[in-house]
Amino acid sequence: MTFVHSDKMLGDNIISADVWECDEMQESCLCLTHRSGLKILISQKKKSTVCGVFAVKYGSIDTNIAGEGDVPLATPYGVAHFLEHQMFTREDGGDWQEDFSALGAEVNAYTSYDRTAYTFSCTHGYEDALKLLLRMVTTPTFDKRSVKKEKGIIIEELRMNADSPWERAYSELLKMMYSTHPVREDICGNEKSIKKITPEILYTCHKRFYAPSNMVLSVCGDVDVDSIVKLCDECIPVEIAVDATPGRCFESDEKMKKHYTEVKVPSKKPTFCIGIKDGESTPRGKQLLKKDAVLSVLSEMLFSRTAPLYNSLLEEGLISPDFSMGTSMGDGFCFISVMGEADEPQKVYERFKEYINSVAEMGPSEKDFLRNRRILYADFVTAFDTTEDIANTMMNYAIDGLSPFDFIDTVKEMTFDDVKIAFESMMKEENYALSVAIPTAQKEGQ
């Protein structure tokens, strides 16, 4: 694919233009740097749908901002998520979603531990939808009335999550594994922290983090590069170019003080969540990419539905088919989690430990490593199938200063020794924890 990427043709506000390419995948995307500091990623695809993602490197773990004299100012837990919800409120009190619907476009948003993203998709008139998205995210409106209303909505959401055995088992696990890191707190915050949020706090955090230099715009579909650049010129003032990257500096989290916790929930069956904490410092850039790939392969080798542990537990009736596992990592945190339903969670936990010990004695399987590395590679390639997947993939890598195609080289260069080292480092009983959500009636009857 050929992109027009002459700085002169793209306008005076584009200070650099690069084409990221992957010959193996026959994929490429254009990466532009706007004078405001905004990174603009464009993948031109002859597809019926256009998808755009406007993201900010600001998530639930970013609870400290620089105050007067650069003294850290603590903000309540849940502000990033609260702010995301409030961005949909227009100045007249209406909802921006109505404007997108009028264009025939869909709009959505989400907040994670370390980023917030706003997305749109449409089959026609992408310029109008993109302009609307840029306006919505860069022109906030926070007032006491809308903030008060939002507090009620989010507090109700928190109460609903408190009744979910899966949500509670997972959240209690994080509180047990991390004593100080903000990842231990729910992305939505808690009732006490939500009540502390004010319009002033929201404006302060928006001004601090929602600056173009801390944001990425990713667009995929049958689009024109020049039209996207012109919209950015129109909606993103260059005079607000500042360095707004979160100054994330988390203290080294101490070792876990306890390895078991349980909580009562209104459910029919116990839900367990096993955590495996990585106590080493979390790298950044391409080293973080490598660690992510290695742990993804390792967790698939050990805990996927094709692995011995899942099948033996299921055949013996110790777990139900509802089962999930995954890895999560970011600045200052890294862990693997395994979740499911079981009448006897403690027995499942013992079997888990026995299983890891047997793998340690025999050594991980190189055959399993090669198979799961191929699967990881194939899954990444498949992610370039739809405009939504492509736009989100480009954003997720670019916001960490990476090209999406860096992952291909990372997977190819990963060795069996990398996985064995990770296994030996993480798979120790001191790193394990078990959180159980027990049905209320069951615990009361014990």
Which residue ranges define each predicted feature?
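Short acidic-hydrophobic surface loop/beta-edge motif
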Residues: 30-36, 253-254, 261-265
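Charge-rich, well-structured scaffold segments of protease-associated domains
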Residues: 3-11, 86, 90, 95-246, ...
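Short, surface-exposed, low-complexity cationic segments
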Residues: 48-60
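Active-site recognition of the HExxH zinc-binding catalytic motif
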Residues: 77-85, 89
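N- or domain-start disorder-to-order transition segments that initiate the globular core
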Residues: 3-51
